[in-house]
């Protein structure tokens, strides 16, 4: 009679080093370090919780989640919420933040101008690092 390995489904604790999940050289790793270099003060005007109110997710966390999602073809705020909850790469990139889909949708809809200014910063950083040329820059919108 054939013998099979026993599968143990009992509870266990698996420690996870979130930083180790962002593999050097990967898009997520580059995104993590790039967003941390950006001046995100343009997003501060959207928050009015200095004195009262709940603390908000840092714009860097939401921006990382949205940009990683968009890079993978995920544009729905509900799908981004699910990825932040279930996908180890999103969990690592956001520091295990679990923003609600309405928080994500609100961030994207009210931050279009701020995101545009961030894009200009990204181009400047990439140019300074010698990662892009100045001859031609094109984005495939398909």
Predicted regions and their residues:
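Detector for conserved single-position "signature" residues within domains
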Residues: 1-142
